[in-house]
Amino acid sequence: MLILTRRVGETLMIGDQVSVTVLGVKGNQVRIGVNAPKEVSVHREEIYQRIQHERAMHVILAKIMDSTSL
């Protein structure tokens, strides 16, 4: 894991097209802004995990439906 230190208003780049800017710090929370192309999905980790779980469930349901239609 790469660990970086940034101050409010400073930005880091991920590749050539994604930038992450520290917008503010309040207590133990950090507000960040992410600029990325539309084709790059940006989610909080808990949302990403939920999406992955739902996709896996759709695959399982599709397999069940296919096996019952034989």
Swiss-Prot record:
It holds the Pfam family CsrA. GO terms for molecular function: mRNA 5'-UTR binding. Keywords: Activator, Cytoplasm, Repressor, RNA-binding, Translation regulation. One of its GO terms (cellular component) is cytosol. Its main location: cytoplasm. It is found in: Cytoplasm. GO terms for biological process: mRNA catabolic process; negative regulation of translational initiation; positive regulation of translational initiation; regulation of carbohydrate metabolic process. The keyword Protein biosynthesis does not apply. It comes from the Bacteria. PANTHER family: CARBON STORAGE REGULATOR (PTHR34984:SF1). A key translational regulator that binds mRNA to regulate translation initiation and/or mRNA stability. Mediates global changes in gene expression, shifting from rapid growth to stress survival by linking envelope stress, the stringent response and the catabolite repression systems. Usually binds in the 5'-UTR; binding at or near the Shine-Dalgarno sequence prevents ribosome-binding, repressing translation, binding elsewhere in the 5'-UTR can activate translation and/or stabilize the mRNA. Its function is antagonized by small RNA(s). Belongs to the CsrA/RsmA family. Homodimer; the beta-strands of each monomer intercalate to form a hydrophobic core, while the alpha-helices form wings that extend away from the core. This is Translational regulator CsrA. The lineage of its organism: Bacteria, Pseudomonadati, Pseudomonadota, Gammaproteobacteria, Moraxellales. The gene is csrA.
